[in-house]
A protein has these predicted regions:
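Juxtamembrane and boundary regions of transmembrane helices in multi-pass small-molecule transporters
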Residues: 1-29, 164-170, 174, 186-187, ...
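Flexible hinge motifs at transmembrane-helix junctions and intramembrane kinks/re-entrant loops
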Residues: 43-60, 257, 261, 268-289, ...
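Generic alpha-helical transmembrane segments of integral inner-membrane proteins
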Residues: 37-45, 63, 67, 97, ...
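Hydrophobic alpha-helical transmembrane segments
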Residues: 37, 56-60, 93-94, 128-136, ...
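Membrane-embedded alpha-helical segments and adjacent helix-loop junctions characteristic
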Residues: 77-168, 313-393
Length: 469
């Protein structure tokens, strides 16, 4: 309680300070950029040490920066609501809400228990084999379905398995989410960041796959080895499944076959439209929400109960995060990073290429990669227009800087759970099941994993681009 009060006082003091300073001194953009940076660092420190719930501090921090922006004239008071609506990515929020409802209805069928028992029997009680099964399945499916959707579908299965085994699921949730982000980076539709990049650079599904799949495939194999090393202590246990799991009748685990059939039909339709949504011009959020609405109607589900299963805290967290990053973008902090990048590389093509990879990877570990990628798109366009860069990369159909951004933003999100939508959702689901994954716990496993996988993938991607000249 004392930590909570202290944290609130600290952040409140930031707000009071900017209020007083803005009234008695002339504030310029440079001062506000510094202030915003300090507030963001304070928020990340509070999240890292879990002093206050992540949703509370992010939403409160967004409010502080929003008020400060109004006081110093960065945002006009009459445009506040328009600004907030504009910076919040409602496509992401809607996608999450729709899929959470579908997963909640699916959970009523008992299918997660059925899949869990299947996976346990297939692994024969070997936790390393079980981790491989979960990671491979998650990575492959995330190539063709948005990784947030895959996490919403698969994490409940994992939690069900390990609740039955009476073993901590945390290493497996981490491994699964890291694998999901890796797999999603391979295709145009696997990660929202790829959709943003593909739209900006006019990259089709096949071209994206041909460039990104090879480095991701090889990197995933390295990733499995790294997971074995990182979680070696947790994987030494051999589970005895000769008792309760061999005696379980799998068919009895499905509580409502009719409901399951309806869920499968709707989910298959949703996934199909996810794959073609770019071609038909319908946002993924509309598809997910439409599927959820249809499922609620045809199954006559208990709406109040289903909505209780929605992770509202995660949705509010995303909204607050989008506001925070939107303010940083409005004030020019993220654009400043782009100018610094050009200054550092001096326009040297390959130095710029690798700088984009690593700056994107490191930054995406601490700033949610969807708004970060959105901000980086105009920066990449500026870099591509640079004479030195264009003289080398201009001969290619697609600038390698787009691949660099896709690789860095996609894999960089594994560094912390804040860095990717899949990570944020995995944390939220785990917490609803009673398992708390700390920022530090994720960082210890995710950051080294991210550094090594980005390093290998960047080498392979570089060789592929050299061969394409």
């Amino acid at each position: 309680m004392e930590k909570h009060i202290l944290s609130i006082l600290i952040v409140t003091l930031f707000g009071i300070t900017i209020f007083m300073v803005s009234h008695f001194f002339e504030i310029n953009i440079s001062h506000f950029i510094l202030f915003s940076s300090i507030v963001m660092v304070a928020i990340y420190v509070i999240i890292s040490f879990e002093i206050i719930h992540r949703t509370s501090i992010v939403f409160f921090g967004a409010l502080i920066l929003l008020i400060a922006s109004l006081l110093v004239g960065i945002i006009h008071p009459k445009e506040t609501l328009h600004f907030v609506i504009d910076v919040i990515d409602f496509n992401t929020i809607g996608l999450l809400l729709g899929m959470m409802i579908i997963v909640a209805v699916l959970g009523e069928t008992g299918v997660f228990n059925w899949v869990g028992v299947k996976a346990i029997r297939l692994s024969k009680g070997n936790l390393w084999k079980l981790m491989i099964i979960l990671c491979v399945f998650t990575a492959i499916t995330s190539m063709f379905v948005d990784n947030v959707t895959i996490i919403l579908l698969m994490v409940p299965v994992t939690l069900t398995i390990f609740r039955a085994l009476k073993i901590s699921p945390i290493p497996f949730i981490l491994a699964q989410t890291l694998s999901c982000n890796l797999g999603g980076a391979a295709t145009l539709i696997g990660d929202p960041t790829n959709i943003i990049i593909g739209s900006a650079a006019n990259i089709d599904f096949t071209t994206f796959f041909l460039y990104m799949a090879p480095p991701i495939f090889v990197t995933f194999l390295l990733g499995l080895v790294l997971l074995k090393i990182i979680f070696r202590k947790e994987l030494t246990t051999v589970v005895n499944i000769s008792g309760q799991f061999k005696a379980v009748d799998e068919k009895s685990l499905i509580k409502d076959k009719s409901l399951l059939k309806s869920c499968i039909i709707v989910l298959a339709g949703v996934i199909f439209f996810f794959v073609i949504h770019g071609a038909i011009g319908i946002e993924a959020s509309i598809i997910a929400l439409g599927g959820a609405a249809i499922l609620l109607i045809i199954t006559r589900a208990h709406v109040e109960k289903i909505l209780q299963d929605v992770d509202w805290a995660t949705l509010v967290f995303f909204a607050g995060l989008f506001i925070l990053v939107g303010i940083l973008q409005e004030v020019g902090l993220i654009a400043l990073l782009g100018k610094i990048l050009i200054g550092i590389t001096g326009g040297e093509p390959w130095l710029t290429f690798h700088s984009v990879i690593w700056i994107s990877a490191i930054t995406s570990g601490f700033i949610e990669n969807i708004p970060f990628t959105t901000t980086m798109v105009p920066i990449i366009e500026i870099l591509n227009s640079n004479t030195s860069i264009n003289s080398l990369f201009g001969s290619l159909n697609i600038s390698p800087l787009w691949w660099a951004l896709a690789l860095g933003a996609g894999l960089g999100g594994n560094g912390t759970w804040i860095g990717s939508s899949a990570g944020v959702v995995a944390i939220g689901i785990s917490l609803k099941y009673g398992y708390k994954i700390s920022f530090i716990r994720w960082f210890k496993a995710g950051f080294p994993f991210m550094i090594l996988t980005v390093a290998l993938a960047s080498i392979i991607l570089t060789l592929m681009i050299l061969l394409s000249f």
